[in-house]
Amino acid sequence: LAKNVAQLHNLPVCIFSLEMSKEQLTYRLLSMEVGIEAGRLRTGRLQQEEWPLLGQGINTLGQLPMYIDDKPNSGVLEMRSLCRRLMAEQGKELGLVVIDYLQLMEGSSPDNRVQEISRITRGLKGMARELNVPVIALSQLSRGVESRTNKRPMLSDLRESGSIEQDADLVLMIYRDEYYNPETPDRGITEVIVT
């Protein structure tokens, strides 16, 4: 999604990767771009005909206005500041901000984590409004999903979710039946649940 916004609309995209390093995320993006497994890219075990594809993919991604910040424990204020700086450098509004993932963000007070997440989601909503940019904040699910017969996620499954559903304009949840049932006839199908 982030790559498409940068590529198709030529708008700067800011990705805050709190879980993965910049290098890991770049390998994933490159893997998607060229259709070669990320592990093979990392090890360099490519077929002769794949090397030119790799070069083209690196060139394509290198031209995109994408910024990846992989500093752990970032907070809303740091993210807002970085987004403003990126907008000033690029001379235009951002096309998208992606945060991977919400529960790894640092709060500004020692309150309980649910209250902290509530402050963070309100801050992200304010940042989106102030900078006029869509913000996609990925979130973890609680382990409760695993104990149910029907594993499709619900709003109540969002970890520390007190305010996520309240502050979000839209919550999308992803479900792949083959993850839980390898023999399912729905192999290769991903459901997007809109709540």
PLM feature segments, named:
Residues 1:
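N-terminal cationic and glycine-rich segments that engage phosphates or anionic surfaces
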Residues 4-93, 107:
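Cytosolic-facing regulatory segments adjacent to core modules
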Residues 8-13, 63, 94, 99-102, ...:
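Active-site lining segments that contact anionic ligands and/or coordinate catalytic metals
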Residues 18, 46, 101-102, 140-141, ...:
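Short, ordered loop/turn segments at secondary-structure junctions
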Residues 21-25, 37, 46, 50-57, ...:
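Helical mechanochemical/support elements of P-loop NTPase systems and associated helical scaffolds
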Residues 24-25, 104-108, 144-147:
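Short acidic/His/Gly/Ser-rich catalytic and metal-binding motifs that mark active-site loops
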Residues 85, 93-137:
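Helical hairpin unit composed of two closely spaced alpha helices linked by a short loop
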Residues 116-195:
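Phosphate-binding/switch region of NTP-binding enzymes
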